[in-house]
Amino acid sequence: MQRLWAPVTLRRVLLLRSVYLPHSWAMQEPRLAVLSPRYFSCTNAIRAKEAHKTSTEEQEEVPLNPPQSLAGTEGLYKADSEPVPHNKGDIDPLQDKSIGIFQRFKKTFKQYGKVMVPVHIVTSTVWFGSFYYAAMKGVNLVPFLEFIGLPDWIVGILRDSQGGYALTAYAMYKLATPARYTVTMGGTSLSVQYLRKHGYLSTPPPVKEFLQDKMEETRELLTEKMEETKERFSEKMEETKELLSERMEETKERFSETKDKFSEKLQETKDKMSFRKKAD
């Protein structure tokens, strides 16, 4: 209440002083009264409170950004409502735009090699024939190679070569590799769609399921091989055991025969010795 009524009280005091004091002093006093510390204490407190409230609202509206010291961890500060990206292994290489053309070309060759090889042969033949025709019409590739800044020894090979149109066509063929791969990928995609539409090519399962099926097949094959190996080993063990038992029986029989013969010989020797003693 004192802070709210302080300006009014000061104005009354100034009016009373203006009546009793000279006019010049009364004109200067309001400035001092207006700049009194109590008046500014009230307004400054209100302004500071409003400024703090405004800064708090601005901080709430500013989106959460990662600090500079944690560069590369932007994913930790994003909202949890973002869709979970699909596994790259499940994406068809013909539809995967997140990788380069050369990686897509390799993956497509691994998955659709039977379709891609004929398409690539046809497109490469068309490309090389077009470049050979352009070379016959007088297209000179040397200024372009010098313009893009290739080494002099490479440019010199093409300039001083006796290969003629074929070498020029081959150089243009190699320079157009990204475009050739792109055309091959497009032709392969159209061919795959056509073959699937007419039932000549089945839709491949996702890579995860494909790998799981392959793992199951491999596991079954390994189990069968292990069972066959166990059976063979057990059969071999039985055969070996039978052979050993037969050998042992034969050895016992031979040993018994040898023992009988030895006992007979010993008995004969004893009889002869006893007969000689009696004769003496």
Swiss-Prot record:
It comes from the Eukaryota. Residues 207-274 form a coiled coil. The chain crosses the membrane at residues 115-135. Gene3D superfamilies: Apolipoprotein. InterPro entries: FAM210A/B-like, FAM210A/B-like_dom. Residues 96-208 form the DUF1279 domain. Keywords: Coiled coil, Membrane, Transmembrane, Transmembrane helix. GO terms for cellular component: membrane; mitochondrion. It is a single-pass membrane protein. It is found in: Membrane. Its main location: membrane. Residues 245-280 are annotated as: Disordered. Pfam families: FAM210A-B_dom (PF06916). This is Uncharacterized protein C18orf19 homolog B. The lineage of its organism: Eukaryota, Metazoa, Chordata, Craniata, Vertebrata.
